[in-house]
């Protein structure tokens, strides 16, 4: 049998067993895309006349997907959930399987930081929006960044 010289080093994390039927339903309902905060932000961006791609890789060779991408301006937007990404204001600590969730959130934060670094290195502007942020305020921030970036990219 022949094996590739490159070997995947990504560790598979064992999913925790839900502590209750309610927890099980909550875990099943968690979506990787098209969340309510994402939809609200996209709606506001669209009202301002901004056009974008959703759930795409900004850099094809990079195995990371952004929630919203403005290709011509080289701007990526990630809408981070307070629980999943450890929001300092609204992030909550899980009571059941606490150690698993602490590690999971730390890994998410490390991946977020690495993603930011890799995209910046590739010439992209990275914007992170917490799910609790006002879609209107986030839209204004993103609009200003897109305008500035388009001016830089199209010089």
Q: What is each PLM-predicted segment?
A:
Residues 2-155:
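Nucleic-acid endo/exonuclease domains
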